[in-house]
């Protein structure tokens, strides 16, 4: 059976993904900041690097899949966290685990992005995220002057982060 790493596996969608994979006989690695097999804060570069290092130590032979479910809602009242976890954390883990996925040949990556409704989409921010995804600090500075207690702003940033993630995945996936 396969080896799958799942972010956000201690609750919500991630927990259900782990449950289904384990029922099918697969080995799972729960990556979560609370109670994971690998405990790390994916909203900061040090936490992301910890995950990448531990995945390489645990499974140098490779991964069959990487399923990225970790995220926070627009109502979390921390605009920087929305972007750093939902977008930057996810793409950093994909990039850092890419060589492990390549080793297995038929590996897959799945991201959770439920930004179907794009009525309040900050397309400008989605474009900035996609075109400058190597400059996290500068992008986080752009949102630091916005009102964290404004639910509409939080939701717009959430949708932009998830839409940008979906676009990033499409740009980097095999055709």
Regions found by a protein language model. Name each.
Residues 33-47, 68:
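Rossmann-fold cofactor-recognition segment
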Residues 74-76, 106-175:
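Catalytic loop of short-chain dehydrogenase/reductase
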Residues 7, 61-71, 105-113:
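Rossmann-fold scaffold of SDR-type NAD(P)-dependent oxidoreductases
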Residues 37, 82-83:
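A hydrophobic alpha-helix adjacent to the NAD(P)-binding/active-site core of NAD(P)-dependent oxidoreductases
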Residues 42-61:
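Conserved Rossmann-fold cofactor-binding substructure of NAD(P)-dependent oxidoreductases
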Residues 7-19:
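N-terminal Rossmann NAD(P)H-binding glycine-rich loop of SDR-like oxidoreductase domains
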Residues 93-101, 168-169:
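Hydrophobic positions on the long internal alpha-helix
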